Amino acid sequence: LLKVGLPGAKEGLSEKDPTIAELLKNHGYMTGQFGKNHLGDLDEHLPTNHGFDEFQGNLYHLNAEEEPEHEDYPKDPEFKKKYGPRGVIHSTADGKIEDTGPLNRKRMETIDDEVTAGALDFMDRAVKAQKPFFLWWNSSRMHVLTRLKEESRGVTGLGIYADGMVEHDKHIGQVLDKLDELGIADNTIVMYSSDNGAEAFLWPD
């Protein structure tokens, strides 16, 4: 998986690799992933082919889908069709796959709002169905480069990284509040971790 990320690359999550979603689904869990999934962009790599009932999110490092907006990106539509990134995907385990449009610079401002709303709805549906659930929510905050909507900018006076962390904290609060609202907080395991999220680019990585 060291080279996962290029649009259309054959590398990605293998069918031989077990996922926690597959293990839990066999025990009656509803399984959903919302947010970043950087494990390959072909259909066979999608989370919904690896144990997840539902997936909503992007398939690359977080600024890859902005590349077609760069001024030096090839203008030939055939190039973009063959080599360009897919958009934000919404897929389900029954084989339905919807490309909801590109994760461009403007949409980057609100993508965490989108996937948080999707995660909250998933939780509602799982509880309504009286099923245990596994939810994997991967926000884009906090990652460089990031883009914030107007109302999130300047709230700390400490720059975009701190402002983004405040927005991130709000989204986490929404998820935790949903557990309380549904009356399942005392019967739910919550794990929080970062994958990287450097506050600045540092050589050599």
Predicted features, each with a name:
Residues 1-205:
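Formylglycine-dependent sulfatase
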